Each structure stands twice: as C-alpha cells, then as structure tokens.
UniProtKB/Swiss-Prot annotation:
Listed GO MF terms: 23S rRNA pseudouridine(955/2504/2580) synthase activity; RNA binding
E.C. designation(s): 5.4.99.24
PANTHER family the UniProt entry points to: MITOCHONDRIAL RNA PSEUDOURIDINE SYNTHASE, RIBOSOMAL LARGE SUBUNIT PSEUDOURIDINE SYNTHASE C
Protein name from the UniProt record: Ribosomal large subunit pseudouridine synthase C
Length: 315
C-alpha cells in the first residue's frame, strides 16, 4: 500500500483565522484527511495550541500557535479518479463570475449541490477548493437549493465570511431571482407574507400558522399564454421559500419536483425545459473589505433563455 506522510506544521494564528473552532481550522488545513482522523489526533493530544492540549470545540485566538502533527494517508491512484468529477470541476472554472482577494462569486449550475453530504461526495464548495488548492480558506457564505441555478457567494477570508454573514442576518443583502410560474401572475400580487414550517422528517415545507414568518416580494417581468416570468426577492431566508410561496399563491414554479404541477411541467417541456426554472440572477451587498456597494449579475444560461424565447414565439 502506498502511503504519504505529511510534515509537522506550525501555524501562527492571525486576526483572520481567529474565532473558528480548532476542528474546523484543521479540516481546512488538512483537506484530504478524514474527519475521523482529525478528531482522533485532537483527542489524543497530538494537536497542540500554545504547547497545550485542547478539545475539538476550542476557539482559536489571534496570537495562538498551533502545532499540527504529521499524519499518514493512503496514496490515491490517480487513475481511479472519476473523470466525470474532474469534468465538473473544470466546468465550474468558467462559471466564476467575480473574484478578488476576499470573495468569489459562482454562477452555480442547476443540479449541483452547494456542498457534499447526504450521499453526495461532490459539491460546489469541494470543486472550488480543488480549483483553488492554494487557497487557505474557502467557505460558503449562504446556500441555494441544488436544482436552483445562479449566484453563490464564497468567502476567501474568515473576516469576509463574518462580514457577509452579518449582512445576511441583518437582511441588508438584496437577492433577486427569476422564476417561471404557472398561469397568469396578477400584477397586484406584489408581496406574499405566509409563515413556513419545515417537516423535519421529509424536509417538505408548508405554509403553516405555527411556522416562521416569511416574506417574498414579486414583480411581473413578462407574461405568456400559460405562464409568467416573475422576479422574486426573498426578504427572509427560509428553506424553499420562493418555491412554497409561489405554490401557495396558486402559481408553482416550472419543474419543481416537490411543489410543482406535472401538467405545467409537460407544457414547458414542449418549450425545451427539463429543470427547475429558478435562477438567482442578481445580488447586492457591501464589500467586506472596501465597504463599497456591490452588485453582481448572473446570466440565466442558454437553456432558460431559449425557453423564454420559445414561449414568446408561442403567443
């Protein structure tokens, strides 16, 4: 069995690294090391902070000195790496629509999860880390559904992550989505205020008086014979919020496998659609370093553009 043994690392913690748990810090430093091994070396006291043992939940402070012990890993056979995974990683390079020293913005394709887990070994964040092996820090600022395409913010510094997530919590980030919904959305329907409750067993979200307050603002962009293209802006950030609010209003989104309408899906399939028509198209926020206002636009993609064009010609 071929094995690789890493070298001892001594890391001085600066302000940007401070505030995170030691286990999360080690997962970023030892990207190919299994989580179980990381927790084992912490538990055994092989990881030292300021020459002392620490627990996994220890939060790093500026000025700490971390000793990361050598670890032994099985050498992977490059021929066993699935080419489909490598192809997906390469494709994402062309979908990075903004990048600087503090953040990166990806125009995530539909069908790609934001991160691995729940049976998925591959996600957008894992792909970006593969594309940027030299990056010391890459973390998701927020999430969008697997089948939703569009803007995904990724922080390249911990300080940027804290700054951007604070903006999301304070609801100062403005997000705008395009959605193709069934039927004629009335111009007068500009706001949907309906509490949402998530079923923890099957993850289905429903409007429920016992749910969390949820608000989405809508604007009609274009009307077609049996569909409407709307702009949706979620004021709150609940799971599946836009998808459930459109369904609740009687206008489910095309190709929504949880909250949609099969007859409408069949109709839009005639116009070339075979995926959820929900796209995170625009985001506005404050840059975490310069404090300047930022506005990022993500094009819808060829398939969605062709569907809209086909619907226009069907009038």
């Amino acid at each position: 069995m071929n094995e690789i043994r890493t070298k001892v690392q001594i890391v001085d913690i600066d302000e940007d690294m401070a505030g995170q748990r030691i286990d999360n810090f080690l997962r970023n430093q030892l990207k190919d090391v299994p989580k179980s091994m990381i927790y084992r070396i912490v538990r055994k006291g092989e990881v030292r902070v300021n020459k002392k043992r620490v627990k996994a939940e220890y939060k790093l402070a500026a000025g700490d000195v971390v000793r990361i012990p050598p670890v032994t890993l099985e050498k992977k056979d490059p021929e066993t790496a699935p080419s489909t995974k490598l192809n997906k990683v390469a494709e994402l390079q062309d979908l990075i629509i903004y990048e600087d020293d503090h953040l990166l913005v990806l125009n995530k394709p539909s069908g790609t999860a934001v991160h691995g887990g729940s049976g998925l070994k591959f996600g957008a964040i894992e792909a970006l880390r593969a594309l940027r092996p030299e990056a010391r820090f890459l973390e998701l600022v927020h999430r969008i559904d697997r089948d939703t395409s569009g803007i995904l913010l990724v922080a390249k510094k911990r300080s940027a992550l804290r700054h951007l997530q604070a903006q999301f919590r304070e609801k100062t980030v403005q997000k705008y989505y395009f959605a193709l919904v069934m039927g004629e959305w009335k111009n007068s329907c500009k706001v949907v205020n309906a509490p949402l409750l998530k079923n923890e067993v099957n993850s289905i979200v429903r409007v429920n008086p016992n749910g969390k307050p949820s608000e989405t603002r809508f604007k009609v962009i274009e009307k077609f014979p049996q569909a409407t293209l709307v702009q949706a802006s979620p004021i709150t950030g609940r799971t599946h919020q836009i998808r459930v609010h459109t369904q609740y209003s009687g206008h489910p989104i095309a190709w929504d496998d949880r909250y949609g309408d099969r007859r409408f899906d069949a109709y839009t399939a005639q116009h070339g659609l075979n995926r959820l028509f929900l796209h995170a198209a625009n985001i506005r926020f404050t840059h975490p370093a310069t404090e300047q206002p930022m506005e990022i636009n993500a094009p819808m993609g060829e398939q969605l553009e062709k569907v809209v064009q086909s619907l226009r010609t069907s009038r």
